[in-house]
C-alpha cells in the first residue's frame, strides 16, 4: 500500500525498488510524529518535540564512508581522505539492501538541497525509520506541495539502519556503511541510526558537484545585518566549535547554521533547518535554540529526560556529549525567509583550541586566511565522532575534511578567488580554552566571543590598535569594548608563562608539520604566511 503525495510516474517502483510493505510519501510533520510514536521509535516530549535515542552510534562514522571508484570520478576524488568502494561491491550492496527492504514499511521525502534554485538539486530520501524522515524533512528544503506532483530526484538516498553490510562481499570496512555512487546517483546508508549521516551525505554530494560550477561549498553558518543582506558574515568551523550558537544572533538575520554555497550572486543555504548541539544549552545565552526544544516536531536526539515531567536534562551526557536537536529554520524568529545573502563582508574561521594558546580573535590577511583554511586547526569536540570522549587537537582541512570529496586546494583556490573578488575581511576566532590547556584552563567566555564578533561585524574592531602575535604572525587587537584586555593576550592568562611558551611552540610545530603536504599546491604569498 502507498499513501501520501508523490509524482505518479516517480514512485519507488519506477526506480526498480519493489516488494516493500507500506510506503509513505512526503508525509508532513504531524503524520510523521504519529507514525514514529505508533512504531515505538521514541517519545513525545514537551510541546510536541520527539525524543529519540540512536543506540551505539551517537556520532558520525567517517571511516565507514566510501566513494565508488568509477572512471568518471577516479581522477577528481581525494582518495587519501575518502575510502574507495568498487562498482561491483556497490552493486552487491544495493542488491542486498533492496532485498532486505522487501516486506518492510518505508518513508519517502522528496526534498531540495540548496536555497538558490539555479544551483539546487532534488533529493529523494528513503528511510526505514519515520523519525529519520521527520529529521531530513526539517534539515533539507521542502518544496511546495504542488511541486511534488512532478518531482524527479537528481539523487536518491536510502537509509536502512537494520541492514548490516558484509565487508568482504560489499568491499567496505565494517557492517556500518555509507556509500556514494556518483554514476548511479545514489547514496546507501546502513547499520547506523545516527541521523547526522543523512544530512552530511547530502553535504558531501554538494561539495563534489558545486565546484564544477565555480561555487564554493562551505562548512559554515551564515547571517546578515537586519535589513541589509549585503552585510553577510560566514562562520567556518568543525562540529561543536560554535557555528550554530554564534550565528544565532538576535541582532542579525540567520541564513543558516551549517552548510552554504558562495556563488557569483552571493551566498545561499543548502538546508532548510538546523541541527544544534544541546549539551549545557542555556536559555539565557541561547534563548532561540533553547526554545526550539519545546516546539512541535523538533527532533531531540540522545538526551535523557525526567520520565514523569519529560523535562530534558541538558547537563547529562551519559548517552553522549553529542546530544542534539533538529528543527526547521523558521523556528528561529529572525531566520531569513529566502535563506540567501550577499557576498561575505566578513569571514570568521572558528577554532576550538584545546591547547589554550590562541587569542580569542585575530585578523587575517587573505594569504593567512588561505593558510588557516587549508590547515583547519581545531579540536574534535567530544561525541561528534565515534570514540571521541574529550577534545582532541586536529587539523581538518577546509574546516570539514570528512565531507570534502575533492582535494583541499580545489576549495582553497575557490575561497582565495572569492576573497580577492569581493574583498572580505577575515578573522580567526578561538572558542576553545584560555588560561591553560583543556583540563587546567577554562572555556572561552561566550559573552567575550560575542562582544568581539559584534565589534568585528559592525566594523568598529578594524579601528582598534593591533599587535602582531610573535608565534603565529597574525594581528591581535590590544583592547575591545566589553572584553578584559588580559583575555586578548593568551600568554597573560596563564599562571605559568614558561608552560604557555612551550605549548605555543608545540602548536607552531604542529602547524608547520601539517602544512608541508600543501606546499606543492600553493603560491608564494601563502607560503610566506605559513607558520613555522
UniProtKB/Swiss-Prot annotation:
Quote the subcellular location field of this record. Answer: Cytoplasm
Note the superkingdom of the native organism.
Bacteria
- Family annotation (SUPFAM superfamilies): PEP carboxykinase N-terminal domain, PEP carboxykinase-like
Q: Which UniProt keywords apply?
A: ATP-binding, Cytoplasm, Decarboxylase, Gluconeogenesis, Lyase, Manganese, Metal-binding, Nucleotide-binding
Q: Name one GO cellular component term.
A: cytosol
Q: Which residues bind substrate?
A: 60, 194, 200, 324
Reaction catalyzed: oxaloacetate + ATP = phosphoenolpyruvate + ADP + CO2
> Pathway it belongs to?
Carbohydrate biosynthesis; gluconeogenesis
Q: Where does Mn(2+) bind?
A: 200, 219, 258
Q: Does the keyword Metal-binding apply?
A: yes
Q: How is the cofactor bound?
A: Binds 1 Mn(2+) ion per subunit.
Q: Which cysteines are joined by disulfide bonds?
A: none
Question: Per its UniProt record, what HAMAP family does this chain match?
Answer: PEPCK_ATP
* Protein name per its UniProtKB record: Phosphoenolpyruvate carboxykinase (ATP)
Amino acid at each position: 500500500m502507498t499513501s501520501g503525495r508523490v509524482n505518479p510516474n516517480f514512485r519507488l517502483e519506477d526506480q526498480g525498488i519493489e516488494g516493500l510493505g507500506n510506503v509513505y510519501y512526503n508525509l508532513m510533520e504531524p503524520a510523521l510524529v504519529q507514525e514514529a510514536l505508533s512504531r515505538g521509535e521514541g517519545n513525545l516530549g514537551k510541546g510536541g518535540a520527539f525524543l529519540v535515542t540512536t543506540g551505539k552510534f551517537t556520532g558520525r562514522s567517517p571511516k565507514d564512508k566510501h566513494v565508488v571508484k568509477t572512471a568518471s570520478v577516479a581522477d577528481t576524488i581525494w582518495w587519501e581522505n575518502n575510502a574507495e568502494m568498487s562498482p561491483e561491491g556497490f552493486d552487491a550492496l544495493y542488491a542486498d539492501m533492496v532485498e532486505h527492504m522487501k516486506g518492510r514499511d518505508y518513508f519517502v521525502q522528496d526534498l531540495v538541497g540548496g536555497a538558490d534554485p539555479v544551483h539546487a538539486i532534488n533529493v529523494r530520501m528513503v528511510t526505514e525509520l519515520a523519525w529519520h524522515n521527520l529529521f531530513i524533512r526539517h534539515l533539507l528544503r521542502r518544496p511546495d506541495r504542488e511541486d511534488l506532483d512532478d518531482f524527479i530526484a537528481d539523487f536518491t538516498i536510502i537509509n536502512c539502519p537494520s541492514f548490516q553490510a558484509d565487508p568482504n562481499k560489499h568491499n567496505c570496512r565494517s557492517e556500518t556503511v555509507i556509500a556514494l555512487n556518483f554514476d548511479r546517483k545514489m547514496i546507501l546508508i546502513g547499520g547506523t541510526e545516527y541521523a547526522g549521516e543523512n544530512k552530511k551525505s547530502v553535504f558531501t554530494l554538494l561539495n563534489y558537484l558545486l565546484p564544477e560550477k565555480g561555487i564554493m561549498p562551505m562548512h559554515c553558518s551564515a547571517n546578515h545585518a537586519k535589513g541589509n543582506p549585503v552585510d553577510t558574515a560566514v562562520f567556518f568551523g568543525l562540529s561543536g566549535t560554535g557555528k550554530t550558537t554564534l550565528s544565532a544572533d538576535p541582532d542579525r538575520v540567520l541564513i543558516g547554521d551549517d552548510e552554504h554555497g558562495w556563488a557569483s550572486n552571493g551566498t545561499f543555504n543548502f538546508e532548510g533547518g538546523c541541527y544544534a548541539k544541546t549539551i549545557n544549552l542555556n536559555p539565557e545565552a541561547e534563548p532561540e535554540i533553547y526554545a526550539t526544544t519545546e516546539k512541535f516536531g523538533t527532533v531531540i536526539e540522545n538526551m535523557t529526560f525526567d520520565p514523569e515531567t519529560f523535562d530534558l536534562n541538558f547537563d547529562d551526557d551519559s548517552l553522549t556529549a553529542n546530544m542534539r536537536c533538529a528543527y526547521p529554520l523558521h523556528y528561529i524568529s529572525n531566520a531569513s525567509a529566502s535563506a540567501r545573502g550577499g557576498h561575505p563582508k566578513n569571514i570568521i574561521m572558528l577554532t576550538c583550541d584545546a591547547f589554550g594558546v590562541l587569542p580569542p580573535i585575530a585578523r587575517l590577511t587573505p594569504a593567512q586566511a588561505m593558510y588557516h583554511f587549508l590547515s583547519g586547526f581545531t579540536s574534535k569536540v567530544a561525541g561528534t565522532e565515534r570514540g571521541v570522549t574529550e577534545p582532541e587537537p586536529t587539523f581538518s582541512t577546509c574546516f570539514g575534511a570528512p565531507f570534502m570529496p575533492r582535494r583541499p586546494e580545489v576549495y582553497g583556490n575557490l575561497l582565495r578567488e572569492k576573497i580577492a573578488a569581493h574583498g572580505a575581511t577575515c578573522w580567526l576566532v578561538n572558542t576553545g580554552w584560555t588560561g591553560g590547556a583543556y583540563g587546567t584552563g577554562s572555556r572561552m567566555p561566550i559573552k567575550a566571543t560575542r562582544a568581539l564578533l559584534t565589534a568585528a561585524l559592525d566594523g568598529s574592531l578594524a579601528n582598534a590598535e593591533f599587535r602582531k602575535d610573535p608565534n603565529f604572525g597574525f594581528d591581535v587587537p590590544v583592547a575591545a569594548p566589553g572584553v578584559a584586555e588580559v583575555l586578548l593576550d593568551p600568554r597573560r592568562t596563564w599562571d605559568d608563562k614558561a608552560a604557555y611558551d612551550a605549548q605555543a611552540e608545540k602548536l607552531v610545530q604542529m602547524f608547520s608539520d601539517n602544512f608541508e603536504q600543501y606546499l606543492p599546491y600553493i603560491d608564494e604569498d601563502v607560503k610566506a604566511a605559513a607558520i613555522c
